[in-house]
Amino acid sequence: SLIQGELAVGDEIEIRPGRKTNRGWEPIVTNVTSLHSGSSERKRVAAGGLVAIGTGLDPAITKSDSMLGSLIGRPGTLPPVLEKLRMDVQLLDRAVGTSGSQQVEALRTKEPLMLTVGTSTTVGIPIQVNEKWLEASLKLPVCAAEGQRIAISRRIDARWHLIGYGILQT
């Protein structure tokens, strides 16, 4: 989805977090070679809908949905890539989708949580927790800006259930 700005064939774009290297995560810079919206090819698209973006990238880089959850923007304009994050937390009274009225228990350190940040989903392991905030180490990095909402899910009865949300702090 294009949520902000415009994109045209020939534009230079940056993809973050990018790809994993032996030095960490490296953004990918490439050019837009084609744009498709609906069933038609376009030269330019504006925010407000789903867009297929063709690039000059080797298909091996994008295999197995390895770019899932990545952000695209003009080089140098995207938020930072985070491998650890801190957020203010608001837990729900009851876990969504559980049978009965499953109360949400307080968060615990080292408890795996599923965190959804924009279109990125990753496992977060809490390092420090108190009733108002959480600091977590992420299994996969995310590209996110301060103030962004993060959905927090916990594994209950072998399934992930929404238990609250957080607001990203820097």
For each feature predicted by the language model, list its residue ranges:
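C-terminal effector/interaction modules appended to NTPase cores
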Residues: S1-T170
